[in-house]
Amino acid sequence: GLPDGVEDLPKAEDDHAHDYVNDAADTDHARFQEGQLCENCQFWVDYVNGWGYCQHPDFTDVLVRGEGWCSVYAPA
């Protein structure tokens, strides 16, 4: 489950860190590969209405979108 209080975190905005985008379809990053989404990354924890908690140190202060992507994506 999610850590206490996580649902109260602000939602990440595009370019929060590591070329993050809320919609993977919006990125033209060289590292992006089709099918890579926050929701299937090893840093992803859980869903709250389409948003989840990211365990990467640069994202622990925000929620990220399941359909999002960033350049430190790592397959789960």
Curated annotation (Swiss-Prot):
Q: Which organism is it from?
A: Halorhodospira halophila (Ectothiorhodospira halophila)
Write the protein's name. Answer: High-potential iron-sulfur protein isozyme 2
SUPFAM superfamilies, sorted = HIPIP (high potential iron protein)
Other facts noted in the record for this chain:
In E.halophila, two HiPIP isozymes are found.
Please tell me where [4Fe-4S] cluster binds in this chain. Answer: C38, C41, C54, C70
Could you tell me the keywords of this UniProt record? 4Fe-4S, Electron transport, Iron, Iron-sulfur, Metal-binding, Transport
Question: What family does this chain come from, according to its entry?
Answer: Belongs to the high-potential iron-sulfur protein (HiPIP) family.
Give yes or no: UniProt keyword Glycoprotein: no
User: A Pfam family this protein belongs to?
Assistant: HIPIP
Q: Name the gene behind this protein.
A: hip2
Taxonomy, superkingdom: Bacteria
**What quaternary structure, including any partners, is listed in this protein's UniProt entry?**
Homodimer.
An example of a GO molecular function for this protein is: metal ion binding
Question: What is the documented function of this protein?
Answer: Specific class of high-redox-potential 4Fe-4S ferredoxins. Functions in anaerobic electron transport in most purple and in some other photosynthetic bacteria and in at least one genus (Paracoccus) of halophilic, denitrifying bacteria.
UniProt lineage: Bacteria, Pseudomonadati, Pseudomonadota, Gammaproteobacteria, Chromatiales
Gene Ontology BP terms:
aerobic electron transport chain
